[in-house]
């Protein structure tokens, strides 16, 4: 029987400890997607090579990430879970799609622009992998005839590039690639820094007090929440307003996601309470969430042979699926 479910693709880099922002923005939805979509969940280790150093163990981080996927409810019997580098078709398609991409559009991508700004426009030492990063991402998506990609508002640019590249290829060679669409959540797609809620929470942040990591010691989270930025409104009021109350809004986003309560309900619950009491409630709920997640994670992480077997089986399934589209691409450009 032909599977008529829409195809959904999502990936996370194993380049460091995943954050509560990763969970809220993407991973919390993964288990619920499995019944409605044909899901492919990728561990994007090739993407990680743009930022790694010799003191970082990529192999360990890949297994850590895989165990977290399972702890978040991804079922290998329902979804394809695989490691990007284990499916060589990603790299093959990446080169072909690079020939349908321009330096101009890649240099306008947010990550490259931010790096360029940081280097004060001196681009000679910027990693070429960072420039080509969005093309590899496009390859990841297009390789599986993906219909939907869960993305945050800040990631729509990458998906637009993917569609542009696919359209260029299709214009020349016919309808080879499916054009993917974004799947954007209403709330929580962009969790902000705790101390500077004008910027996104990032696992690469040099100030770790800005970030809540999924695997960190829960006691340290207490101090991070305690010191999280709020505001000076008098008397203190707890409501969602991303223009005037960035810090409070961010904490409400986090709490809403891990309790599955709508923000307007939380606003009513916290009417009239002090910020310190609100923070204590936020911490209590984060603590319960992390304890449950970490307990499940440790069970999976202890069995490396099980994790490696999941990765092996997932790679076999992913290669079978990706080879179909790659053969069509090779035939179109006459390198078959």
Swiss-Prot record:
PROSITE patterns: AA_TRNA_LIGASE_I
The protein's Enzyme Commission number: 6.1.1.2
Gene Ontology molecular-function annotations: ATP binding; tryptophan-tRNA ligase activity
Single biological process term from Gene Ontology: tryptophanyl-tRNA aminoacylation
Location(s), subcellular: Cytoplasm
Main location, first listed in the record: cytoplasm
CDD domains: TrpRS_core
Alphabetic keyword roster: Aminoacyl-tRNA synthetase, ATP-binding, Cytoplasm, Ligase, Nucleotide-binding, Protein biosynthesis
Binding site for L-tryptophan: 140
Annotated Pfam families: tRNA-synt_1b
Domain of life of the organism encoding this protein: Bacteria
UniProt keyword Nucleotide-binding present: yes
Catalytic activity entry: tRNA(Trp) + L-tryptophan + ATP = L-tryptophyl-tRNA(Trp) + AMP + diphosphate + H(+)
Residue ranges annotated as motif 'KMSKS' region: 200-204
Protein residues bound to ATP: 13-15, 21-22, 152-154, 191, 200-204
Function: Catalyzes the attachment of tryptophan to tRNA(Trp).
Record's subunit section: Homodimer.
Name under which the protein is recorded: Tryptophan--tRNA ligase
């Amino acid at each position: 029987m032909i599977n008529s479910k829409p195809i959904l693709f999502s990936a996370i880099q194993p380049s460091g400890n995943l954050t509560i922002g990763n969970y809220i923005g993407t991973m919390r939805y993964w288990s619920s997607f499995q019944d409605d979509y044909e899901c492919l969940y990728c561990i994007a280790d090739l993407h990680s090579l743009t930022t790694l150093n010799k003191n970082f163990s990529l192999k360990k981080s890949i297994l850590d990430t895989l165990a977290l996927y399972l702890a978040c409810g991804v079922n290998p019997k329902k979804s394809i879970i695989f490691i990007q580098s284990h499916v060589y078709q990603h790299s093959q398609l990446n080169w072909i799609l690079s020939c349908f991409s321009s330096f101009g559009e890649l240099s306008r991508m947010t990550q490259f622009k931010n790096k360029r700004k940081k280097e004060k426009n001196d681009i000679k030492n910027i990693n070429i992998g960072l420039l080509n990063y969005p093309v590899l991402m496009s390859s990841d998506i297009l390789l599986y005839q993906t219909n939907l990609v869960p993305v945050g508002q800040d990631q729509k640019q990458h998906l637009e590039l993917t569609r542009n590249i696919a359209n260029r290829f299709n214009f020349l060679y016919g309808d080879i690639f499916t054009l993917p669409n974004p799947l954007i959540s209403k709330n929580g797609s962009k969790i902000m820094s705790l101390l500077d809620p004008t910027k996104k929470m990032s696992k690469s942040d040099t100030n770790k007090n800005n970030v809540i990591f999924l695997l960190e010691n829960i006691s340290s989270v207490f101090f991070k929440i305690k010191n999280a930025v709020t505001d000076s409104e008098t008397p203190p009021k707890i409501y969602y307003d991303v223009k005037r109350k960035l810090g409070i809004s961010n904490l409400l986003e986090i709490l809403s996601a891990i309790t599955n309560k709508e923000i307007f309900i939380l606003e009513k619950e916290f009417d009239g309470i002090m910020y310190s009491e609100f923070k204590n409630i936020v911490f209590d709920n984060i603590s319960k969430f992390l304890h449950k997640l970490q307990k499940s994670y440790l069970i999976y992480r202890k069995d490396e042979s099980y994790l490696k077997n999941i990765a092996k089986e997932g790679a076999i399934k992913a290669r079978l699926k990706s080879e179909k589209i790659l053969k069509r691409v090779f035939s179109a450009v006459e390198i078959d």
